[in-house]
């Protein structure tokens, strides 16, 4: 699964293209945060405390705290789990999610739309892996449709919550609602 399958879909493309920068940051922060369970499972298996780091960095992203994020890309690079060392499936999930976080930070710092696409692609790899683990012959079209519906809901929520004066990690949790992975 990739960005184009979901975001080039006519039902989402128009709404997505109208989003402000702040709304996009909220949207993609929530889209990543909905997978936080995967990093928590990684932590429980490997005791790396990566979920705290993930949540902290995501909090800086939502606050658009460029000062704190300036040098964080290198720190993120150092925290990406190596699947040779962390060989269980949780290592792959955590690796994909931390790389997705890195791309989200790069988008914020450089306003690079391609970084958003890479962020989503890494996140979708986890969705693909999860579904493959459940059923090797899963219906990708069905999963894509489900992810598109979630994105549509997140777009609506991001638009609504972006009107708040201050957005933080709790705002992201509100956007996720009950749509956890």
Predicted feature residues:
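Glycine-rich, aromatic-bearing surface loops/beta-hairpins
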Residues: 117-181
């Amino acid at each position: 699964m990739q960005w184009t399958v979901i975001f080039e879909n006519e039902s989402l493309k128009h709404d997505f293209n109208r989003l402000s920068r702040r709304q996009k940051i909220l949207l993609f922060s929530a889209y990543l945060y909905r997978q936080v369970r995967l990093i928590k499972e990684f932590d429980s298996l490997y005791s790396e405390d990566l979920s705290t780091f993930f949540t902290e960095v995501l909090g800086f992203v939502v606050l658009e705290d460029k000062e704190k994020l300036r040098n964080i890309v290198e720190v993120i690079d150092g925290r990406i789990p190596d699947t040779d060392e962390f060989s269980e499936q949780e290592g792959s999930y955590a690796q994909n999610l931390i790389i997705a976080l890195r791309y989200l930070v790069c988008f914020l710092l450089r306003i690079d739309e391609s970084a958003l696409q890479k962020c989503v692609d890494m996140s979708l790899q986890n969705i693909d892996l999860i579904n493959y683990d459940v059923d090797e012959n899963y219906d990708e079209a069905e999963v894509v449709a489900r992810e598109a519906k979630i994105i549509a809901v997140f777009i609506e929520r991001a638009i609504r919550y972006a009107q708040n004066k201050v957005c933080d990690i709790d705002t992201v949790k509100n956007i996720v609602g009950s749509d956890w992975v």
